Each structure stands twice: as structure tokens, then as C-alpha cells.
């Protein structure tokens, strides 16, 4: 996916990101939570999660990590992209816009991916979880289009640290041993 590099999403870029969420349908088993210093941003997800925290359903996400080597340098530095999430607009839309307007910093954004196929059991734990700390909302795009036609939004988050937790997930929804990696941009 190429971005034009000006730091802002134009409509064509937003429509390409919207494709992240609509290729496999709107009922993927992904969720996001946004914690604003202990206060969760609540959407309309009726699902109950193992940790009891409120989450918002996600249609898709995009984040990159890579090494960049400056000319003449002997070691590479770690580069982290912004986090883009694609979601259907809901009750949390105005709350997320308020985080942008107020330039709120210090958010914790958690993206959870479940393999168990959308089970409604509260014991389901994610097979992959991305936790972004030191976050802020940098941009929001509101649009319809693509094959979904539903009101959607793309939220671009900046952050300081990305933690990745992955584990095998059993058919019951419980996960096995967790592997962890923390990435901090240098």
C-alpha cells in the first residue's frame, strides 16, 4: 500500500484502507480498546471479554515496523508507522473525534485478534494482541464507499511503543503460552 507521503489521508488512500476491512466481510473477529488514562472509550460491541473491558469491533488495521539505515551508518534504526484502524461508525465516533480535538496524549490502544471464529464466550482470549502505549489520535477520516457502503471511519494513531503478544489459541478460546516483543522507534 503506498501513501502519498504528505502525512494526511486523501480520499483515494482512505478508500484503499477501507478495503482492509471489507475483503473478508464486516464480521471479522477483531476488537479494539482505547484507554484514556483509565477511562475506556466505549462503542456498541455487545460482546463480553475475558478481562471485562469494553471494546469496539474492528474491520481492519494497518501498521508497519522496519529497519532504516541512514547513508554512512553502520547500524539500522527501528522505524514504526502510524497505526491505521478501519471501523464502522458507531456511538464511539464522537468520543474518538473528541480525543483528536483535545489533542489527548497518553492513550493506550489495544487491538485484539481472535481465532475462535467469533465465539461469544467471555473466556475467549486473543491469539494476537497489539498494545500501543503513549498514543494519540492524529487523524480521522469518515467515509462510505468500496463494497461496504456503510458509514466507516479510519483512525490514524501515533504512539511511542508497540507491544506484540501472540499465542496459540485452542478451540475453546483459551490461549497457550504467550510470546511477547516490545518495539520502540529509535
Report each predicted region and the residues it spans:
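Glycine-rich, low-complexity intrinsically disordered segments
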Residues: 1-186
